[in-house]
Swiss-Prot record:
Xref: SUPFAM superfamilies: TSP-1 type 1 repeat (SSF82895)
Protein name: Thrombospondin type-1 domain-containing protein 7B
Cytoplasmic side: 1577-1606
Main subcellular localisation: membrane
PANTHER family, per the entry: SPONDIN, SPONDIN-2
Compositionally biased region (Polar residues): 1586-1595
Membrane topology, as annotated: Single-pass type I membrane protein
Occurrences of domain TSP type-1 (ranges): 40-98, 102-177, 179-233, 336-392, 399-482, 484-543, 601-661, 662-735, 737-796, 797-869, 871-924, 925-998, 1000-1125, 1127-1181, 1182-1245, 1247-1302, 1303-1368, 1370-1431
Originating organism: Homo sapiens
GO CC list: plasma membrane
Keyword check for Glycoprotein: yes
Stretches assigned to the Extracellular side: 32-1555
Positions of glycan attachment: 150, 190, 219, 683, 757, 842, 933, 1186, 1308, 1456, 1524
Subcellular location: Membrane
Length: 1606
């Protein structure tokens, strides 16, 4: 019991343990899963890449943020994600800058062909099954970002910075699938010849290939057995036999096993073993260097068999007749081309870092050691290239190149004037517009930091390294013209004053006069005259008392003695009031005695003002004088005080008593700015070279005293106060050292050896980019250096050295005897020779050297013949006979028969074995013929200025006599082209030509300025030019001319209106107009003298009276009156008071006078005051400045163009329109305009500046006729102003010399040579000839020596190919069919593409059904074509015949084809009814349904099929009465019967149901009966009495009802 219980417990424990283990494993796996799940709960998520920062180009850096994410989407600490798979945060990038848009662009290729869209997933049937017109497709194209400069591909992100990427695919349509279209079968061929089984065949050709998934072409051949095989007659075999030769085996050497002890050789026709045994008597060693290279001669065999016309083999004896074909021949053991080992890789072409992403390249090469022979493998490529990338930060940046320029050279006016007048010569200082030039060169760009560290300036390099347009080498410039100051007139002489009023000394002083500058001088040579003149004087006074007198007041009573009040002020020499303490002591008295006349006293007027001085200066002969006077107003009465004598009525005094010799200071021009030690030490700036550069200096000049009309005098004679400065500060010009570029690199010496003994030199140069100035370091003398290249070796000349030919090597004797059984060794063989390459000093060289310098390697092997006993033998050919000078002569050579051949009849046949060969002698007569058009007229080249870069007008020829050329085609007597040097030394015929010279418009010189058009005020001065010659032939055009062919310039001018004015003297005494002269009072007259004076000099010298204005001449006489003693005497009227500036008419003007003597009878005196209104232009005047228009732009006399000045003049005009003195406007303090001159620019007349002609380009063709070469020139400076326009001819062309073309021409393939067989494998050969032609190979090409064509471009395999001639019974391919017409792919009649297709095909011909399994496949060939047409295909059908007709497909041009038409739309060719018409009297109709015969009607079932044919009643009677109805029963068209057969009035249909028309007729009859009944009722009914009611009145409405109206 216990054991059982223990067992139970054990089982239970074991089961419990199993469950526990299972639970633990589940828990562990779950924990591992959770742990793994925990590891997979966090993932890295990178953000988008940021912008590329850093330098422009490939050195940029791009960064992005990287986060650690939980799978639920929330971010976590970075430590939760694994560091190993963390995405990168930074990467290098190409930073795109805006200027990159000029360097990169999208390059888009053409759209590729439209291809079908791939089938959708799960779609089984092709989409083309439902195609109607076209099917959907896709077109792709290549879009890439490229660098414009070298068309290299870069990252697309660069171009995306500027423009979106163009699409790379688009939808398109593909035409529906088009099956292969073939022509109709040709007629059956004739039955094969012979008796027995005969076959005939027919073929067809492909017209259009299958396209767009269409069906492939069907078989193009059909064969069938002839119907009636002809039995062979007795004695004639059923089959024909042909000798079939097989292909030659590979060339091999004899095996040891082929030779047995008996000397017999067992031939192995099929052996292609590579095992070789070299027999010494069968090989010839060709020594090359120290290593032997044997050319081995082996043999090759072929099989010969007899084949029957049905393709079966037959006994060989049935085919052999006269001779047995050759089955073994000598051959060359093939040897492959042998090359040397590859050289080491060259350094990578990219050796620096640049912005280009294009990799570099490196290459390696190998040489040919032995050429391939015997059909061995040709030489492989001898040069190998591959891309390479050199990486690393230590790699230096690639140099960048940019255009650099020197400073502009000095402006040269001569360059401009030479254009206008080639014979112009400098006659004085020139200024104005000119041309300045500079050097333009290409140099390596240096970073700014490096440029600061390095003192060496840039080095010029080749200009081809710089891209982009070069800076202009010349430009217009301007030399400022110098103009002198414009000054005003001299002022009046001042008072005599001390030289220094602050420290007066001595009794001598100076009187001065001034003038001021109206317009400053311009330019470096502009000069101002002296502005102050002085004269010495006595008793100088700097300050003076100026007293004004009042009227006389009586001291007692009303007359008698009295006094005047004096008012004195102290004034300086300028008339300004100053303190009285400055004037001399004592001051003038305040009172002055005077006398008032009593009633009977004589009355005198007041003294007049002192007149102007009679002279401007005094000399020994005369002095200047001034006068004043007074007049008698009333005579004295009885007892009164008498009048003074006439002498007492005038007073005189001296004036301008100074000498006429004026003194003034003169100055020399300012000297150059020089250093002042003290000033320079304080202001200098120190440059990097430690020398003083710029600062402040001083300028000095000499000052000396000049006496007018005498010259220089002692300086103390001139007042020191007006002495000009002799020293002034100036800016020191910076010292400019000459700066030159570094020398360019030496031009490279040739790495390759040089032919001949010519001296090769290399050179370098440097360019002056800054000239020395202001004492700087001068430029070096050497700017160009040249030296001879060292270690330049002469190229050795290599040539081939062939050895003698070896003896003729035949097939091995054992092989030969094994086949023929003859011991005679004769027939065709091969002979070899060694060819080595040697130098000109007979040293061995590599074969590659000779291959480079020669036109190919000489032959190593050639065929030879060992004559047999039966062969004809000859002596060697003699030399050709000498030629005479006659071109008709021939040369010949001879040979003779030798030995027994002289007696053999076949050897006497001169056609087979000619003994004389004749050739035409070379002829030195050549025929020249002009070809092509004449070239442009070409002028000789002109001189070029090396530093200006411009063509010198005087030396360059743009017109005149030149030459034009025409090519010469030279040919020999046979019409073959030869080198043109045989006919002409240059290959051209030339003749003189003339290019008309342009003549510019020529005008005269400027006339002198005319006088001012106005003598007073503002006028115009004019000068003019007139036309001398008109322009023609493209000369400089004329400016705009007037009707008189003149051009004018006008400038304003001004004449001072008071320059010449009338000066009046004092009035004389009044003379009474009384004849008796008894009365001494009353009216009378008085006179005065007038004269015309020039007031411009300030003194008023008398001039001719005609110069003054005659309209303003003052009166010389006037009426006057002397008051009688008893009359009241008044003084003369004083001046009118001033009117306001506005001339207000409400304002009055007043003048007064006072009583001098009362009347005796106490009568009232005349008025003592007068008033008048201020009226404009009567007694009140206004003044204003008047400005002229700007003048034309005025240049200096020596300036042709450039900076000028435009001026305008200022005048003062009265309100009445009359010009007045400028003083009037100045006195009223009117605002003066500021700018009286402005700068202007006269456009320079610049002729078009052209570069020199470039060198002639290479001929557009290497040989032949039709080639052209050209040269061009460029516009350096376009025409400006009225310059000579640029010529339209910037390119010149001429025909190239007609040189002969030499080409290798392959001949046609020969017929297949079987070498004794009737069919089988043979060989075709063709010739390779050197032909000469004039550009196109045609029938006119002639054959010449092979050496003229150079190295042969073809291998032997191109000149020989295997071929086969089918044996009777063999299945073989036909020749190619003709190319079909060009057909386009079209949709709905419109072309789908521009290029069409045409096809041709080859099919097979079966000659025996037994061999049809071995037939080759038919071949289809398609090529593109142009000029195609759209064709459409339609089904055509013939008329029915016994329910059958012919259906075919026809192309739109009428060609019957197979394919092209839709199979679904094919019409039926056989007419049949389903099910068949088996009912009595039924037949199958054209519609394909059963119908009934005539006289029966169809009874149809519900499903539309015929049930039975029911006889039409009465049809028998009509049939029986044939005689009576014969005239009516004419034949009726069965089709018409079928049409109207269904119209019989049968009430039942074939199914027995009532027809619809029966129901219609019944319904219609019922309606008619009801209508008749109703009508009868109305007619019979009694009518009711008629009652009418008045119509109801409707209200009238005026509304318009449009609907009612409508």
């Amino acid at each position: 019991m216990f054991p059982k219980s223990n067992l139970t417990v054990t089982c239970w424990v074991w089961r419990s343990m199993r469950k526990l283990f299972l639970l633990l494993s589940l828990l562990l796996s779950h924990a591992a899963h959770l742990e793994g799940k925990k590891d997979n709960q966090f993932i890295w998520k990178p953000g988008p890449w940021g912008r590329c920062t850093g330098d422009c180009g490939p050195g940029g850096v791009q960064s992005r943020a990287v986060w650690c994410f939980h799978v639920d989407g929330w971010t976590s600490h970075l430590s939760n994600c694994g560091e190993s798979n963390r995405p990168p945060k930074e990467r290098s990038c190409f930073r795109v800058c805006d200027w990159h848009s000029d360097l990169f662009q999208w390059e888009v290729s053409d759209w590729h062909h439209c291809v079908l869209v791939p089938y959708a997933r799960g779609e089984v049937k092709p989409r083309t099954a439902e195609c109607v017109t076209a099917q959907h497709g896709l077109q792709h194209r290549m879009v890439r970002c490229i660098q414009k400069l070298n068309r290299t591909v870069v990252a697309n992100e660069i171009c995306e910075h500027f423009a979106l990427q163009p699409p790379t695919e688009q939808a398109c349509l593909i035409p529906c699938p088009r099956d292969c279209v073939v022509s109709e079968f040709l007629p059956w061929s004739n039955c094969s010849k012979g008796c027995g089984k005969k076959l005939q065949h027919r073929t067809r050709a492909v017209i259009a290939p299958p396209l767009f998934g269409g069906l492939q072409c069907p078989n193009l051949t059909e064969s069938r057995a002839c119907d009636a095989p002809i039995s062979c007659p007795l004695g004639e075999e059923e089959y024909t036999f042909s000798l079939k030769v097989g292909p030659w085996s590979k060339c091999r050497l004899p095996h040891l096993k082929e030779i047995n002890p008996s000397g017999r050789t067992v031939l192995d026709f099929n052996s292609d073993s590579n095992e070789r045994v070299t027999f010494k008597h069968q090989s010839y060693k060709a020594h090359h260097h120290s290593k032997s290279w044997a050319i081995e001669i082996g043999y090759q065999t072929r099989q010969v068999s007899c084949t029957r016309s049905d393709g079966q083999n037959a006994m060989l004896s049935l085919c052999l007749q006269d001779s047995f074909p050759l089955t073994v021949q000598s051959c060359i053991m093939p040897k492959d081309c042998e090359t040397s080992q590859w050289s080491s890789w060259s350094p990578c072409s990219k050796t620096c870092r640049s912005g280009s992403l294009l990799p570099g390249f490196r290459s390696r090469s190998r040489n040919v050691k032995h050429m391939a022979i015997g059909g061995g493998k040709e030489c492989p490529e001898l040069l190998e290239k591959e891309a390479c990338i050199v990486e690393g930060e230590l790699l230096q940046q690639c140099p960048r190149y940019s255009w650099r320029t020197s400073e502009w050279k000095e402006c040269q006016v001569s360059l401009l004037l030479e254009q206008q007048d080639p014979h112009w010569h400098v006659t004085g200082p020139v200024c104005g517009g000119g041309i300045q030039t500079r050097e333009v060169y290409c140099a390596q760009s240096v970073p700014a930091a490096a440029a600061l560290r390095a003192k060496e300036v840039s080095r010029p390099v080749e200009k081809a390294l710089c891209v982009g347009p070069a800076p202009l080498p010349s430009q217009l410039c301007n030399i400022p013209c110098s103009t002198d100051c414009i000054v005003s007139s001299w002022s009046a002489w001042g008072l005599c004053i001390h030289e220094n009023c602050h420290d007066p000394q001595g009794k001598k002083g100076f009187r001065t006069r001034q003038r001021h500058v109206l317009m400053e001088s311009t330019g470096p040579a502009g000069h101002c005259p002296h502005l102050v003149e002085s004269v010495p004087c006595e008793d100088p006074m700097c300050y003076r008392w100026l007293a004004s007198e009042g009227i006389c007041f009586p001291d007692h009573g009303k007359c008698g003695l009295g006094h005047r009040i004096l008012k004195a002020v102290c004034q300086n020499d300028r008339g300004e009031d100053v303190s009285g303490s400055l004037c001399p002591v004592p001051p003038p008295p305040e009172r002055k005695s005077c006398e008032i006349p009593c009633r009977m006293d004589c009355v005198l007027s007041e003294w007049t003002e002192w007149s102007s001085c009679s002279q401007s200066c005094s000399n020994k002969n005369s002095d200047g004088k001034q006068t004043r006077s007074r007049t008698i107003l009333a005579l004295a009465g009885e007892g009164g005080k008498p009048c003074p004598p006439s002498q007492a009525l005038q007073e005189h005094r001296l004036c301008n008593d100074h000498s006429c010799m004026q003194l003034h200071w003169e100055t020399s021009p300012w000297g150059p700015c020089s250093e002042d030690t003290l000033v320079t030490a304080l202001n200098a700036t120190i440059g990097w070279n430690g020398e003083a550069t710029c600062g402040v200096g001083i300028q000095t000049r000499r000052v000396f005293c000049v006496k007018s009309h005498v010259g220089q005098v002692m300086t103390k004679r001139c007042p020191d106060s007006t002495r000009p400065e002799t020293v002034r500060p100036c800016f020191l010009p910076c010292k400019k050292d000459c700066i030159v570029t570094a020398f360019s690199e030496w031009t490279p010496c040739p790495r390759m050896c040089q032919a001949g003994n010519a001296t090769v030199k290399q050179s370098r140069y440097r360019i002056i980019i800054q000239e020395a100035a202001n004492g700087g370091q001068e430029c070096p003398d050497t700017l160009y250096e040249e030296r001879e290249c060292e270690d330049v070796s002469l190229c050795p000349v290599y040539r081939w050295k062939p050895q003698k030919w070896s003896p003729c090597i035949l097939v091995p004797e054992s092989v030969w005897q094994g086949i023929t059984g003859s011991s005679e060794a004769c027939g065709k063989g091969l002979q070899t020779r060694a060819v080595s390459c040697i130098s000109d000093d007979n040293r061995s060289a590599e074969m590659m050297e000779c291959l480079k310098q020669t036109n190919g390697m000489p032959l190593l092997v050639q065929e030879c013949t060992v004559p047999c006993r039966e062969d004809c033998t000859f002596t060697a050919w003699s030399k050709f006979t000498p030629c005479s000078t006659n071109c008709e002569a021939t040369k010949s050579r001879r040979r003779q028969l030798t030995g027994k051949s002289r007696k053999k009849e076949k050897c006497q046949d001169s056609d087979l074995y000619p003994l004389v060969e004749t050739e035409l002698c070379p002829c030195d007569e050549f025929i020249s013929q002009p070809y092509g058009n004449w070239s442009d007229c070409i002028l000789p080249e002109g001189r070029r200025e090396p530093h200006r870069g411009l063509r010198v007008q005087a030396d360059s020829k743009e017109c005149g006599e030149g030459l034009r050329f025409r090519a010469v085609a030279c040919s020999d007597k046979n019409g073959r082209p030869v080198d043109p040097s045989f006919c002409s030394s240059s290959g051209y015929i030339q003749e003189k030509c003339v290019i008309p010279c342009p003549f510019d418009c020529k005008l005269s010189d400027w006339s002198s300025w005319g006088s001012c058009s106005s003598s007073c005020g503002i006028g115009v001065r004019i000068r003019s030019k007139w036309l001398k010659e008109k322009p023609y032939n493209g000369g400089r055009p004329c400016p705009k001319l007037d009707l008189k062919n003149q051009v004018h310039e006008a400038v304003p001018c001004y004449s001072e209106c008071n320059q010449y004015s009338w000066v009046v003297e004092h009035w004389s005494s009044c003379k009474i107009n009384n004849e008796l002269r008894s009365l001494r009072c009353g009216g009378g007259t008085q006179s005065r003298k007038i004269r015309c004076v020039n007031t411009a000099d300030g003194e008023g010298g008398a001039v001719d009276s005609n110069l003054c204005n005659q309209d303003e001449i003052p009166p010389e006489t006037q009426s006057c009156s002397l008051m009688c003693p008893n009359e009241c005497v008044m003084s003369e009227w004083g001046l009118w008071s001033k009117c306001p500036q506005s001339c207000d008419p409400h304002t009055m003007q007043r003048r007064t006078r006072h009583l001098l003597r009362p009347s005796l009878n106490s009568r009232t005196c005349a008025e003592d005051s007068q008033v008048q209104p201020c009226l404009l232009n009567e007694n009140c005047f206004q003044f204003q400045y008047n400005l002229t228009e700007w003048s034309t732009c005025q240049l200096s006399e020596n300036a042709p163009c450039g900076q000028g000045v435009r001026t305008r003049l200022l005048s003062c005009v009265c309100s009445d329109g009359k010009p007045v003195s400028m003083d009037q406007c100045e006195q009223h303090n009117l605002e003066k305009p500021q700018r009286m001159s402005i700068p202007c620019l006269v456009e320079c007349v610049v002729n078009c500046q052209l570069s020199g002609w470039t060198a002639w380009t290479e001929c557009s063709q290497t040989c032949g006729h039709g080639g052209r070469m050209s040269r061009t020139r460029f516009i350096i400076m376009p025409t400006q102003g009225e310059g000579r326009p640029c010529p339209t001819e910037l390119t010149q062309e001429k025909t190239c010399p007609v040189t002969p073309c030499y080409s290798w021409v392959l001949g046609n393939w020969s017929a297949c040579k079987l070498e004794g067989g009737d069919c089988g494998e043979g060989v075709q050969i063709r010739s390779l000839s050197c032909m000469v032609h004039s550009g196109s190979i045609s029938h006119a090409a002639g054959r010449v020596e092979d050496a003229l064509c150079g190295e042969m471009p073809f291998q032997d395999s191109i000149l020989k190919q295997l071929c086969s001639v089918p044996c009777p019974g063999d299945c073989h391919l036909t020749e190619w069919s003709e190319w079909s017409t060009c057909e386009l792919t079209c949709i709905d009649g419109r072309s789908f593409e521009t290029v069409g297709r045409q096809s041709r095909s080859r099919t097979f011909i079966i000659q025996s059904f037994e061999n049809q399994d071995s037939c080759p496949q038919q071949v289809l060939e398609t090529r593109p074509c142009t000029g195609g047409k759209c064709y459409h295909y339609t089904w055509k059908a013939s008329l029915w015949n016994n329910n059958e007709r012919t259906v075919w497909c026809q192309r739109s041009d009428g060609v019957n084809v197979t394919g092209g038409c839709s199979p679904q739309a094919r019409p039926a060719a056989i007419r049949q009814c389903i099910p068949a018409c088996r009912k009595p009297f039924s037949y199958c109709t054209q519609g394909g349904v059963c119908g009934c015969e005539k006289g029966y009607t169809e009874i149809m079932k519900s499903n539309g099929f015929l049930d039975y044919c029911m006889k039409v009643p009465g049809s028998e009677d009509k049939k029986a009465d044939v005689k009576n109805l014969s005239g009516k029963n004419r034949p009726v068209n069965s089709k018409i019967h079928d049409i109207f057969k269904g119209w019989s009035l049968q009430p039942l249909d074939p199914d027995g149901r009532v027809k619809i028309w029966v129901y219609g007729v019944s319904g219609g009859a019922f309606l008619i009966m009801i209508f008749l009944i109703f009508t009868s009722y109305l007619v019979c009914k009694k009518p009711k009495p008629h009652q009418s009611t008045p119509p109801q009145q409707k209200p009238l409405t005026l509304a318009y009802d449009g609907d009612l109206d409508m």
